[in-house]
Amino acid sequence: KDKFDYAPQDYSDAMDSYDKVLEITGEITGEIINPNAEGVDEEGPHCADGRVEYASGTRQNLDAMVKAGLNGMTMPRRFGGLNFPITPYTMCAEIVAAADAGFGNIWSLQDCIETLYEFGNEDQHSRFIPRICAGETMSMDLTEPDAGSDLQSVMLKATFDEKENCWRLN
């Protein structure tokens, strides 16, 4: 407890924290996300000034989740996360997806932080992870002929060219 701020005192304290976050997630999905779902589908995203803008309900959903501290749940507190294990996050993701599967996909893009946290350097951590936890940025873009958005079918590979000091694609 002395080493980590906000560390649970014991098992019961940890479970209380997880239960509270699940309760908050349920409240947000029941009061905001689910009621917005149909309108989000009808409005859809649109392009404005060369940028993709979410439907207004999607923005409300994201704002509510960020305000509740539910972005970057598994990240350390120094980056704005809750320092939770993956299991409570996954349970929250199930609740969100049950309310609106499309929004569940958007909100769960925070999964990408795990890769950045594991393999990124400290500069990348400090520049990007707090912004993701704050809901300022996150995306995953992938496509390839004959694969589309099916990540399992992507064949592109990157290899490092030491001679040229750069990455080469296929």
Where are these regions (language model features)?
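Amphipathic, small/basic residue-rich leader segments at the start of a protein or domain
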Residues: 1-104, 123, 127, 166
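N-terminal glycine-rich flavin-associated loop
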Residues: 104-122, 148
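Contiguous, well-ordered alpha-helical segments that form the cores/surfaces of helical PPI scaffolds
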Residues: 63, 90-94, 110-118, 140
